[in-house]
Amino acid sequence: MNVDIQKIREDFPILSRTVYGKPLVYFDNGATTQKPRLVVDALVDEYYSVNANVHRGVHYLSQQATELHEASRETVREFINAHSTNEVVFTRGTTESINLLVSSFGDEFMEEGDEVIVSVMEHHSNIVPWQLLAARKGIAIKVIPMNDKGELLLDEYEKLFSERTKIVSVVHVSNVLGTVNPVKEMIATAHAHGVPCLIDAAQSIPHMKVDVQELDADFLVFSAHKIYGPTGVGVLYGKEEWLDRLPPYQGGGEMIQHVSFEKTTFNELPFRFEAGTPDYIGTTGLAKALDYVNGHGIEQIAAHEHELTTYALQRLKEIPHIRIFGEAAERGAVISFLVGDIHHFDLGTLLDRLGIAVRTGHHCAQPLMQRLGIEGTVRASFAMYNTKSEIDTLVAGIERVSKMF
């Protein structure tokens, strides 16, 4: 990576703190990333100097806040290379984005006996909403299997399509295995069957270039907090020709043009899907986070994280009795593992006492855990500010804990 990692780390104040008297080693980036100072400063500054409700306000502060909010939408559009800001819907996060799409798409286009295709490695947020729709409308959920390396079986995927298949909804990068799924190829396959695709990009957007036009994605979702932005803000991208055909998800202010007791006419895109007061300050934080990523270059970030992941795999494999889950040729900056008979919770707890933050459990992917034949793992996930020396600290910590069992 052709940037100064130490300088990057200085942009993230939390990385200088200690935990139990030890320097913080933060390897829980798959759950949420830390925030650079310029993001936090932007949030504080807007609260102090610009705070006012957006849209329809005639006063100066409201107009200024609206300009910032809509400029943030343009920043997102440019970052993912959408055609228009009409295709960028702000939500509270990936989970709400998926629920919005499932509800609106399901109501408009799916009937009893229709089918959605998902994969075995989905996060619960891309399983449970479809199950709720299945309970309500009687749709069927078909599941793409994977091999023992953690790679989706594309031949089996092809076989799942039928005349009742209405949509494919798959994760781009597994939050457990790190597998980078070939979503461009999978989208092309779906389109050959006349079926649209929803891509869960929560674990890919911080780590690699995501271009919705290059992928030809019909819908794509992600969260701000996974890419150095604030919590409570997410994005639903949808091709305009698809979004224009979907009914609203929620009713309320802003998503309407005219209301009477007899009839309501709905607003134009994207506001039709943004009922109520948006997190207009959070969207500023997201835009600043995307600017920060652009400032360092997503390709350079990806190269650095690939180097880190390769090094981590090499070092972790030196530990006796370690089991690393996922051996896909294309993988992201996530490594899940177990060591001997040590329970994942015990290992994670004892690493925490050494100042090392990892995630333990099923990672909201219980069907995948069932496929792997385990209850949970320890997960280390990396970001642009992590270093090889931190990986050495992790390995030393695991070795120290292992001697206790």
Locate each region found by the language model.
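Pyridoxal 5′-phosphate
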Residues: M1-F405
